Amino acid sequence: MASWLPETLFEIVGQGPAPSKDYYQLLITRTQIIFRWWKISLRSEYRSAKPGETKESHEDFLDNSHLQVQVAVVFGTKILDYVFNLCEGKFDYLERLSDRLLLKIICYLDLEDIASLSQTSSKFEKLCKSDLLWEQIVQSTCDTITPDMRALAKNMGWRQMFLTNNIQLQRQTRKKKQRQENQAEKLA
């Protein structure tokens, strides 16, 4: 399974805590941690300061409390915990699957489970709210999808259409049809 992993497992950039304006990058690869920093200052003594870089193996990072503190100060303890997990070989394989495959899997979940999954990460939030997923859900729950339904879904989105009850859906479809008929009469 580790062969599925890309070379770069995680990357984050950020600014140091106030009053610092320094810029930082943390890059986790399959074999090492790379911590980079750029000194940002208006003071003349820092104008010629070169960017810095520290490279450590995963094992060395787990023993380097100084670098761990720097990561926690700049990026927070949640990021530090995540980096610990990556260094210990605890990878989030599910998150790394292709969107297409994840959408196929998510289609089989109950609506409550989809709602819960959407709260786990920004990637799953995007997928769980995507029109592609909700179009598949609507297709699996409806016998037929009419052209009017497709047109309505194009305007309001498949998720919103699914969540709208049948009476409202029929009313909106009728209003759209009336508007189209009125426009056709005006053009004639």
UniProtKB/Swiss-Prot annotation:
<comment type="function">
    <text>Substrate-recognition component of the SCF (SKP1-CUL1-F-box protein)-type E3 ubiquitin ligase complex.</text>
</comment>
<protein>
    <recommendedName>
        <fullName>F-box only protein 36</fullName>
    </recommendedName>
</protein>
<feature type="domain" description="F-box">
    <location>
        <begin position="91"/>
        <end position="137"/>
    </location>
</feature>
<keyword id="KW-0833">Ubl conjugation pathway</keyword>
<dbReference type="InterPro" id="IPR036047">
    <property type="entry name" value="F-box-like_dom_sf"/>
</dbReference>
<dbReference type="InterPro" id="IPR001810">
    <property type="entry name" value="F-box_dom"/>
</dbReference>
<dbReference type="Pfam" id="PF12937">
    <property type="entry name" value="F-box-like"/>
</dbReference>
<comment type="subunit">
    <text>Directly interacts with SKP1 and CUL1.</text>
</comment>
